[in-house]
């Protein structure tokens, strides 16, 4: 029972870390990467689909992405979706190829991005702590129902705290890596 609660908590903590990594991947550093456009959705025959399902997205160079739609009718729709996204990008269409040039980051914008990733990291830490709190309340409930002893409950709380500390450290490591990549010129 205790192992099940700990395992369940660890799985939830892994999901929080993966969610944080996903959020970090959408915040661009100095290099172009196709994942930058993952959050853009296109109206494709009445349904909203990710850009990657209607076009091939590739990196042309360190500052340029290239989107090649599979249907030529979609060129203007994709271009409009990229322009209206909150990414601040201006696509250029040449024939059926859309090129997206990424402007260099200013020091001010880098500072804003660092603030954003710190907020995301803090949200992840809060999620991890909430998972720990839920596990501890489950342990207390088991203790109250006399399914486990005080010693077992104390050990379980100690173990879940060690797991929590480990995941908080992972968040810090990911935050530091992302912060370094954003501040790199």
Curated annotation (Swiss-Prot):
Keywords: Cytoplasm, Protein biosynthesis. GO terms for cellular component: cytosol. It is found in: Cytoplasm. GO terms for biological process: cytoplasmic translational termination. GO terms for molecular function: ribosomal large subunit binding. InterPro entries: Ribosome_recyc_fac, Ribosome_recyc_fac_dom, RRF_sf. SUPFAM superfamilies: Ribosome recycling factor, RRF. Its main location: cytoplasm. Pfam families: RRF. Belongs to the RRF family. Responsible for the release of ribosomes from messenger RNA at the termination of protein biosynthesis. May increase the efficiency of translation by recycling ribosomes from one round of translation to another. This is Ribosome-recycling factor. The gene is frr.
